[in-house]
């Protein structure tokens, strides 16, 4: 990087860090986004903080440029945050699995635990190409902790299970976490133990969502809260996930699993699906009165960028959401509970 580019980036990093000062706990144990280059002026770079571990993500750069950029970021941020104990570089555009999952540039091993809203979450920062703990769903974890008391919860596409753990921490009566990967679900089990939660209240199952949903429907199993937070795109022998083209189909697979009066939580992170398109698709599903959009859960400003730090906008307008990660809580009624024009229940 030439001097002008280095000077520009250090200025952007300094400004971003200034606006996140209130999020920097002592001792450091939380998880925050320190810099979102997509929105804050340097698209090849995202910097996250997990307790004392700095995770540097590079995008669309070769190995040499990624390393040079990460070393510059390391030097700049360690001068301001001298308690950082580890720097991990993840090269998202690399063809080498180890480089994508992360190489330690500084310090010892990455942290294995973060705290959020009074809950501990296990980390496995090198398990996958992302960090394994999604910062954009922080608000949803808070909602679950606040609203899941005495509720049964199904967390589909659970990944490392943080949403289900948040529900248990909020007093859920039972949580079922399903994901195709048993390795990812092991992280959920580790989080359960960190919080000394009742292990009998959480069931994990390494199974395809479409298989599990079919089995549950046949058994007439229902849950008070069902969460669908799928990957952007996935194709398995039993089904397809496409967050741009098939949101309605996925919702219709999940809604029979929700109890009458329960909640369906839908997360869509399709970058090129506008907020208006997504909310329009959901509103079309509410026309018969069986579904009601209750809440839109915003993404934290450390992820979206602050008014004073944002330079670039998403490629499509996210409104009425504040980020391409679009989170909606939908109330579900069963057909027998919908009143007819004579104010009688349908039988």
Walk through the language-model features, giving the residues of each.
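Conserved SAM-binding motif I beta-strand of class I
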Residues: 174-179
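Conserved SAM-binding loop of SAM-dependent methyltransferases across substrates and taxa
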Residues: 160-173
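Conserved class I S-adenosyl-L-methionine
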Residues: 150-159
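Non-catalytic substrate-recognition/targeting regions of SAM-dependent transferases
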Residues: 41, 48, 69-134, 142
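S-adenosylmethionine
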Residues: 209-288, 292-295, 320
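C-terminal catalytic and target-recognition region of SAM-dependent MTase-like enzymes
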Residues: 263-347
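Non-catalytic accessory regions of SAM-dependent methyltransferases
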Residues: 1-51
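S-adenosyl-L-methionine
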Residues: 181-227
């Amino acid at each position: 990087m030439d001097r002008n580019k280095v000077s520009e980036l250090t200025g952007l990093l300094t400004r971003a860090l200034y606006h996140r000062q209130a999020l920097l706990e002592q001792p450091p144990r939380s998880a925050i986004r320190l810099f979102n280059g997509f929105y804050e002026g340097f698209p090849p770079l995202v910097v996250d903080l997990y307790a004392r571990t700095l995770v540097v993500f590079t995008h669309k750069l070769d190995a040499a440029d990624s390393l040079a950029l990460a070393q510059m970021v390391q030097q700049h941020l360690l001068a301001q945050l001298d308690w950082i104990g580890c720097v991990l570089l993840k090269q998202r555009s690399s063809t080498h699995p180890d480089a994508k999952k992360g190489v330690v540039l500084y310090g010892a091993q990455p942290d294995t635990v973060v705290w959020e809203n009074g809950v501990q979450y296990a980390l496995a920062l090198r398990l996958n190409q992302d960090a394994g703990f999604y910062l954009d769903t922080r608000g949803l974890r808070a909602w679950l902790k606040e609203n899941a008391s005495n509720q049964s919860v199904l967390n589909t596409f659970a990944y490392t299970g943080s949403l289900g753990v948040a529900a248990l921490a909020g007093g859920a009566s039972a949580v079922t976490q399903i994901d195709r990967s048993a390795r990812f679900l092991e992280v959920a089990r580790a989080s359960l133990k960190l919080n000394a939660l009742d292990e009998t209240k959480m069931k994990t199952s390494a199974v395809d969502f479409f298989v599990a949903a079919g089995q549950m429907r046949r058994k007439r199993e229902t849950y008070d809260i069902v969460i669908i937070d799928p990957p952007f795109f996935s194709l398995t022998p039993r089904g397809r996930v496409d967050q741009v083209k098939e949101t309605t189909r996925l919702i219709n697979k999940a809604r029979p699993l929700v109890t009458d009066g329960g909640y369906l939580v839908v997360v869509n992170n399709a970058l090129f699906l506008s907020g208006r398109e997504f909310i329009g698709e959901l509103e079309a599903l509410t026309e018969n009165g069986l579904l009601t959009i209750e809440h839109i859960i915003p993404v934290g400003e450390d992820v979206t960028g602050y008014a004073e730090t944002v330079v670039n906008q998403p490629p499509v307008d996210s409104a009425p959401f504040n980020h391409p990660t679009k989170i909606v809580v939908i109330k579900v009624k069963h057909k027998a509970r919908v009143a007819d024009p004579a104010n009688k229940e349908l039988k």
